[in-house]
């Protein structure tokens, strides 16, 4: 059975990879252990968040699916950090996790060029260092020139609840043990990571009346630029708190916690610790927040965000019932920790293709990341690049100044990770340029060029770009004088008067200036769409800082654009230390800029490398 691209794993990375490949016209096969669980939210029933919302918007701008599906099945929408600057705001949605699965599965089953087979991949087939296909537990062999592995926590997965251990990729689902062995046989180095999840509670056993209520935004904002007429049904979340009794119950059972007994060897996520880890590390705190989140529109089960645990079941019940509002709580699904194998991501190119095996791509948690959004972003890029490679085209490699996706992948392949990696706005050097609301302007052109965004959507994006350019030119070039009429106009807008000529941009840049005021400032803005208005306001208010960051990038542009030829002989360069040569050979950076990001590569080494690349180009 022959295909062009095979995707192994039907989680968030696998969905984006298989959809991108199929939508780019490639005959694609998705192999997954359980078809009903395609798109399952293994942990929290939410998409987005700080920095993660940026990733979802970027996935959408490139023509990916996560944002569209979230808008269709979301049950609460909020913008986090709304009072702060636009660079650090993050969109987040609670999703109906059941409907999310059904939506994604139906979408995949109805996508042309895409087939699904419920099997367990056991062996990755290759010949002379090139991928040839995949073998499954049913002894079926599927041939393909490109294979994308998106196994999540299923790669040699091991679940822990107290002293009990269970080989599984998720509760009730088999793990993929043989695939780990196959990856090792291909010469890849594997490590071990750990994550966990919390108990799910029967809603009718929770006393919501004494919990703090947290509603969604009054005017919810859609994730996808392509979502129209957005008016979701929203449910509230709630906030509860642990207390000293809870903490004492947990402390007295540390000897039963796999995290502390040595039973768990994998390293867990630093920024999403289990409740027992929190109590151990932050013993001085008298309480911890718990966010009580509905799992579906029917709200029959609630997810206890902040209560991830692998303590024994009876201890989970005891510590849960010590929390106010949960005195009579009943657990529907217990919390657990899970260990799984991952591939050290420094063995990847920026295209997410492995360096050792041509045609083999990895995406998602197998690369050491944590989070649906990080997985989806990698899956999309792997699917795109596998399809481009089949057409003998250059891979799409997003720079750090272009996208959070670029930051994510560059961090993984140049620095690696020894713990589950999650995205933060602080990881992006140029975050003022990488805002959520301008993702479509940054990346929409790529999505359209790849055939993943249609002409109508692209024309809308270009219209916003045109409105932004013309709006900024008008505001920067138009002076407002302190005439009587202008002072009256400012007063009518509830704005401070001026005493000298200033550009309209200076007025719009004021913190108090809103889109409503801009529409009244000049007739050209009256009928502009909200997306264009948002762009104009943000660019005006942060014009100085945006300009500074663009200047920094411009100075580095020469270095960013200089490509390092594949199989470049670094050892032939005199003046490079053995340490520098070894690191360049190990990471194989595609550009000078990528080389400069590698720890231990000095500016002097970059200058020498630049000279030798130019010399080799002249010789060629």
Curated annotation (Swiss-Prot):
Q: Where does FAD bind?
A: 9-14
Q: Which GO terms describe its molecular function?
A: flavin adenine dinucleotide binding
One biological process term in Gene Ontology: tRNA wobble uridine modification
SUPFAM superfamilies membership: FAD/NAD(P)-binding domain
Query: What are the GO cellular component annotations?
Result: cytosol
Needed co-factor(s):
FAD
Cellular localization per UniProt: Cytoplasm
The principal location of this protein is: cytoplasm
Q: How does it assemble?
A: Homodimer. Heterotetramer of two MnmE and two MnmG subunits.
Family in the record: Belongs to the MnmG family.
* Record's function text: NAD-binding protein involved in the addition of a carboxymethylaminomethyl (cmnm) group at the wobble position (U34) of certain tRNAs, forming tRNA-cmnm(5)s(2)U34.
**Name of the protein:** tRNA uridine 5-carboxymethylaminomethyl modification enzyme MnmG
Q: What is the lineage of its organism?
A: Bacteria, Pseudomonadati, Campylobacterota, Epsilonproteobacteria, Campylobacterales
């Amino acid at each position: 059975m022959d295909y062009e691209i095979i995707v192994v794993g039907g989680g968030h990375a696998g969905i984006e990879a298989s959809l991108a490949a199929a939508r780019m016209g490639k005959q694609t096969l998705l192999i997954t252990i359980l078809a009903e669980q395609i798109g399952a939210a293994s942990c929290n029933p939410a998409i987005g968040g700080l920095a993660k919302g940026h990733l979802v918007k970027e996935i959408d701008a490139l023509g990916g699916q996560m944002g569209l599906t979230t808008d269709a099945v979301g049950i609460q929408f909020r913008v986090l950090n709304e009072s702060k600057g636009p660079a650090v705001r993050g969109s987040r949605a609670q999703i109906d996790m059941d409907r999310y699965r059904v939506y994604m599965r139906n979408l995949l089953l109805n996508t042309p060029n895409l087939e699904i087979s419920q099997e367990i991949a056991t062996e990755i087939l290759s010949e002379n260092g090139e991928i040839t296909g995949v073998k499954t537990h049913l002894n079926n062999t599927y041939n393909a020139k490109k294979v994308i592995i998106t196994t999540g926590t299923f790669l040699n997965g091991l679940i822990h609840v107290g002293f009990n251990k269970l080989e599984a990729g998720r509760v009730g689902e088999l793990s993929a043990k043989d695939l780990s062995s196959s990856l090792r046989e291909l010469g890849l180095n594997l490590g071990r990571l750990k994550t966990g999840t919390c108990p799910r509670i029967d809603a009718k056993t929770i006393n919501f009346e004494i919990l703090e209520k947290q509603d969604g935004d009054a005017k919810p904002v859609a994730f996808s630029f392509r979502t129209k007429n957005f008016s979701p049904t929203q449910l509230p979340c709630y906030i509860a708190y642990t207390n000293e009794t809870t903490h004492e119950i947990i402390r007295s059972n540390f000897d039963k916690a796999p995290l502390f007994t040595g039973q768990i060897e994998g390293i867990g996520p630093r920024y999403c610790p289990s409740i027992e880890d929190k109590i151990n590390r932050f013993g001085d705190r008298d309480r911890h927040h718990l966010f009580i989140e509905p799992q579906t529109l029917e709200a029959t089960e609630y997810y206890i965000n902040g209560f991830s645990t692998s303590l024994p079941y009876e201890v989970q019940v005891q510590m849960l019932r010590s929390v106010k509002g949960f005195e009579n709580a009943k657990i529907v699904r217990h919390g657990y920790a899970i260990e799984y194998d991952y591939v050290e991501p420094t063995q990847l190119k920026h295209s997410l293709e492995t360096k050792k095996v041509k045609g083999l791509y990895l995406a998602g948690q197998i690369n050491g990341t944590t989070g649906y959004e990080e997985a989806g972003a990698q899956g999309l890029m792997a699917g795109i690049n596998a399809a481009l490679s089949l057409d003998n085209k250059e891979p799409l490699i997003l720079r750090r100044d272009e996208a959070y996706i670029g930051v994510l992948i560059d961090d993984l392949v140049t620095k690696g990770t020894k713990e589950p990696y999650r995205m933060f706005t602080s990881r992006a050097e140029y975050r003022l340029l990488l805002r959520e609301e301008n993702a479509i302007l940054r990346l929409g052109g790529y999505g359209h060029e790849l055939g993943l965004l249609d002409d109508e959507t692209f024309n809308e994006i270009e219209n916003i770009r045109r409105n932004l350019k013309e709006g900024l030119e008008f505001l920067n070039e138009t002076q407002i004088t302190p005439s009587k009429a202008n002072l009256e106009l400012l007063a009518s807008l509830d704005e401070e008067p001026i005493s000298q000529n200033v550009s309209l941009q200076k007025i719009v840049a004021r913190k108090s200036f809103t889109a409503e005021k801009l529409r009244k400032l000049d007739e050209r803005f009256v009928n502009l769409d909200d997306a264009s208005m948002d762009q104009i306001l943000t660019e005006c208010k942060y014009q100085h800082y945006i300009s500074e960051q663009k200047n920094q990038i411009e100075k580095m542009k020469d270095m960013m654009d200089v490509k390092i030829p594949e199989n470049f002989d670094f050892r032939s360069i005199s003046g490079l230390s053995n340490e520098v040569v070894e690191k360049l050979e190990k990471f194989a950076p595609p550009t000078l800029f990528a080389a400069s990001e590698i720890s231990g590569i000095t500016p002097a080494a970059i200058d020498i490398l630049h000279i030798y690349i130019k010399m080799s180009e002249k010789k060629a």
